[in-house]
A protein has these predicted regions:
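Short, surface-exposed amphipathic charged segments that create phosphate/polyanion-binding patches used
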Residues: 155-163
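Bacterial N-terminal signal peptides
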Residues: 8-19
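Sec/Tat signal peptide C-region and signal peptidase I cleavage site
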Residues: 21-25
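A short, acidic, amphipathic alpha-helical segment used as a generic capping/interface helix at domain edges
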Residues: 163-173
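Generic beta-sheet signal
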Residues: 63-65, 177-183
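Positively charged n-region of N-terminal signal peptides that target proteins for export
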Residues: 1-4
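Active-site-proximal alpha-helix that buttresses catalytic centers in soluble enzyme cores
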Residues: 27-145, 150-154, 194-202, 207-212, ...
């Protein structure tokens, strides 16, 4: 049964619908999807939905936006804020070898699942670009500077990035393929209150500029094996 949730006021265990209308600039990140026109409320905890074999079957038909977080990084080497240089990876938190191998496996899983990717939008941060190269070596990514890592930004600096992420999740995908956005967990946290783990593929159904998008399900790296097992029953 399809359940539609109104923004962040209630938990949803099937599909969460999010309006394309932006949250007010003064709203805290955790309330980024709170209903407009109401007094501030505490945002409900985001309910992650595990993908099923039915999710894979939907993705094979195309028409979805897939948000993929980059691979594992070395947290002992933080971004050199405010002197991060997008052309100098030594100024950024680096992707680890384990993170690179994780992304190779995620890319292999997406191909094994026969999920068509028509667009690949990638954050300009080195960890995202390197993750894209590891996962999708035969695709040509489009580097989108409005997918930058937002955790160290002011509200004003975050605004165009969150608006762009909302647009990418809301804009319909045509041609029997899917759009894949490879970026950062804090960006999605700002938008819908969800902080996915490294290498997690998050599935959204675009509904257009006015209606926004539906959150469908998530595929953490460890779930792929179970999905393939179901697929071959």
């Amino acid at each position: 049964m399809k359940t539609t949730c109104a923004f962040a006021l209630i938990e949803c265990f099937a599909v969460m619908a999010f309006s394309a209308t932006p949250a007010l600039a003064d709203d805290p990140p955790s309330a980024a999807v709170a209903l407009q026109g109401l007094a501030p409320v505490a945002a409900a905890k985001f309910a992650e939905v595990a993908a099923t074999i039915d999710t894979l079957r939907l993705l094979r038909t195309g028409g979805y936006t897939l948000y993929l977080r980059h691979g594992n990084t070395d947290n002992t080497i933080p971004d050199r804020v405010p002197a991060v240089d997008l052309n100098d990876c030594s100024t950024q938190r680096p992707l680890t070898e384990a993170g690179r191998q994780l992304m190779v496996k995620v890319g292999d899983a997406i191909r094994k699942a026969h999920i068509p990717i028509g667009e690949l939008k990638v954050s300009p941060m080195c960890r995202a670009r390197e993750s894209a190269a590891a996962a999708f070596p035969k695709l040509s990514p489009e580097i989108d500077h409005n997918l930058m890592y937002v955790a160290n930004f002011t509200d004003g600096e975050k605004a165009p990035i969150i608006a762009n992420t909302r647009r990418l999740l809301s804009t319909p995908v045509t041609g029997g393929s899917n759009r894949l956005v490879l970026a950062h967990a804090p960006n999605l946290m700002e938008l819908i209150g969800y902080f996915p783990k490294e290498g997690t593929l998050v599935v959204f159904s675009p509904r257009g500029a006015k209606l926004g998008f539906d959150y469908i399900a998530s595929i953490p790296p460890a779930l792929w094996g179970d999905l393939f097992h179901q697929d071959h029953k």
